[in-house]
Amino acid sequence: MQTNKERLIAALQEPLESTFATYKTSALGLVDDQVEENRDTYGENVITKGQEDSMIKKIYESIINPFTVILLVIALVSFITNVWLAKPGEQDPTTSIIIVTLVLISGGIRFIQELRSDKAASNLSRMIVNTATVLRDGSEQEIPIDEIVVGDVIKLSAGDMIPADVVLIDSRDFFVQQSGLTGESDAVEKVCLRKADSQNLDSLLESESLAFMGTNVISGRATALVLVVGDETMMGAIEQTINTYDEPTSFEREMNTISWLLIRLMLVMVPVVFVINGLTDGDWLEAGVFALSVGVGLTPEMLPMIITASLAKGSIIMAKEKVVIKKLNAIQDLGAIDILCTDKTGTLTQDEIVLEYPLDIHGDLDLSVLRRAYLNSYFQTGLKNLMDRAIINRTHKEAKKHEIVRDLDQNFHKIDELPFDFERRRMSVIVKDEDGVVSMVTKGALEEMLSVSTYVEYKGEIKRLTDEVRQEVLAEVAQLNEQGLRVLGVSYKTDLDENEIFSVEDEGDMILTGYLAFLDPPKPSAAPAIKALAEYGVTTKILTGDNEKVTQAVCEKVGLDVERILLGSEIDTMTDQELAQVVETTTVFAKLSPDQKARIILCLKNNGHKVGYMGDGINDAPSMKVSDVGISVDTAVDIAKETADVILLDKDLMVLEKGLVEGRKVYANMTKYIKMTVSSNFGNIFSLLFASIFLPFLPMAPVHLIVLNLIYDLSCIALPFDNVDKEFLKKPRIWEANSIMRFMAWIGPISSVFDIITYMLLYFLLVPMILGHGYNHGAADAAAFIMVFQTGWFIESMWSQTMVIHMLRSPKLPFIQSRPAFSVVVTTLAAAFFVTSLPYSPLASILKLSQLNGLYFVLLFAIIVLYMLSVTVVKRIYIKKYKEWL
């Protein structure tokens, strides 16, 4: 079989019929029976992003991580000392069995959660499908891109993403943006085989008749034959040979910072605890096992699962709110945005533009203006925007009553066109009428039309465009703009040579025939949505290519206060430093090119803002790519959907507001777990240091530490589903390692104080009272003393860790001002009561736990109440000092 390069070269050199024969297809496309055969022969149209992990690998990765490796080392050491090296009759594998069981339980829970999350992500990704138009059995069909096979004949038009490597077999004014492959930012014209002057066989990317997967159509139309699919395409080859790098989000960076902080703490604490206990007890092996257990206790090993569960839960809820998340981390980023940049069309307005008035240069209704506008909109092969559709619809309506606009598509035929671009802000078509007269008809932004017009037409009479007429036109248009009407100018020139090769230089010395006034009414939901976003700390900025007066009028109608308006022409004269200052106080940016939009967003980001960009057009893709969160809609062009991180199933700011709130809920519940766990573990450091220095025995057996840690983690599984205070949702939130470390330093030591109080009560009061003797009363009595002491601290640790969750989860008073989710109440109480019941269960002898008397539980209740009151007092001081809690 030929290589992909050989196939492309052969298609350029051989007659088209020969190429059709090679792939058993025709100009009418593949027949259904041939589709599967070609798929088997040439492969599927899927680029391998990395082989999907096998089930065994997924299980392995769920169970094996740095923390479980430490646990398994402890289990191995315990097995060696308590089974392998133990004397006959003294062998006890209990600790090893418990540790291995806990590892399997923890890994199993994570594995199940990961499977659920993967399934949720897969279901969500299937909700957004890029499609292509193919010819099968001579009829057009819309199919998912991954179902395309070699030999398919596809139809391409403006806004499409090219789904495979193809050769053009027919084309009309077909321009492609292939900067992703070549780095060249300008659109490149492609022509079909029969029109190509020559083909560059040395650099296939420069071939006039080949187009490649991943590039997108800027304007025009084409019919193409699919030659190469999937991994063998140019894009597929690049994917296979380079490591794609995604810049880590602020969330990922802060998570890395926190992880390394915990690792450093562990690396310091484990050796210290090992040395102190070894010197105190003289049992270095036992000290080593305990030190490793401390290492496990200091690490929130369930953190990856909690994060995954929070993000997956958030994505599922958002899907119900018509928000599809393409990347899970985008949920948190969406909640963090404090500036939303968006175009006004379809966001603030209804996306249903109506042509209100076709006007001559003096502002009177004139259907000859509509006639020429129709020729431009109907015959252009670019993506027909809302105004093109409005022109065509109005013409069809008027054609029922007025002959001047009847049968225009039959009375004219197209010669050529000059596609729209964002520099000229206009587009032209060249048409010939039944009498053989060739004309160029141009429409575009009024200022641009005045710049290329030398004459004006009024009631059939052509005069020179004077400054007086120019000012009259501008004044009339300004008045329309202030009413919220968008205005396009229409110019033309006649008696052209149809054999001429037309270019943008021909757009000159034209006759301005009039202008078109469009109404794009505001959405009823726009005003409340903007108000809601503002209440959530999100500033809305409008970035548009439209006229500033129209944009201002629309903004006023939807209640968006316009602080300042900045034009694209002004931006071009500014340095980045100047623009960075101005963007802070500007609400509306008008008459922008795509590059200017992207530059504004970069300036906002450099100023420290988290920026979301919402768009749906070809020109929006660069802005979405540089923003923190790219937002699009399911009706957007393919390239916009491909670039977006978040896709709305309804182009409505109200929908976005719901997604933003859910993002903040996800952040809130993840930060709860991290701050609670890190502060609790930090407090344990001081408790264990004190115990290691002042107690003549281990305050808790290694197996106790491990069981305690696992049950506490299981009690936190419900946190992703916890309620979040409404006040917390009102501000954008970003991850800050400093905030987490500060929280840890304030809250952690409080638990240490009460742990030490528990030590003192157990050592000097409770254990002697229960046993009738102190620690130094013989070896057998010492063993009993240690068991009761360890049981007492084991239970107190669980109660303090789980009950304080309710104090820490909100800055408000728990249960009175802020109610936790029912699942959080159930899991925390279940964990506390389960641990409390262990000394009275059959597991007591296995875990070496002892029953406690009533006085212990009275004192335990007092300690927990005092602990929670102390946390409340410190919480108030902390909030007053730092103006934040979570």
Describe these PLM feature segments.
Residues 95-129, 136, 246-339, 516, ...:
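Hydrophobic alpha-helical transmembrane segments
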Residues 73-98, 261-299, 312-322, 500-501, ...:
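Helix-interface capping motifs at the ends of transmembrane segments in multi-pass membrane proteins
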Residues 64-84, 100-110, 129-130, 260-278, ...:
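Alpha-helical transmembrane segments of multi-pass membrane proteins
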Residues 210-218, 333-512, 518, 531, ...:
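Cytosolic catalytic regions of ATP/NTP-dependent phosphoryl-transfer enzymes
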Residues 527-529, 535, 547-558, 595-603, ...:
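Acidic, divalent-metal-coordinating active-site segment for phosphoryl/phosphodiester hydrolysis
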Residues 44-76, 118, 140-141, 201-210, ...:
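Soluble-to-membrane junctions at the N-terminal ends of transmembrane alpha-helices
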Residues 1-140, 146-149, 154-162, 167-247, ...:
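Non-lumenal N-terminal regulatory segments of integral membrane proteins
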Residues 273, 304, 311, 558, ...:
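Membrane-embedded transport module
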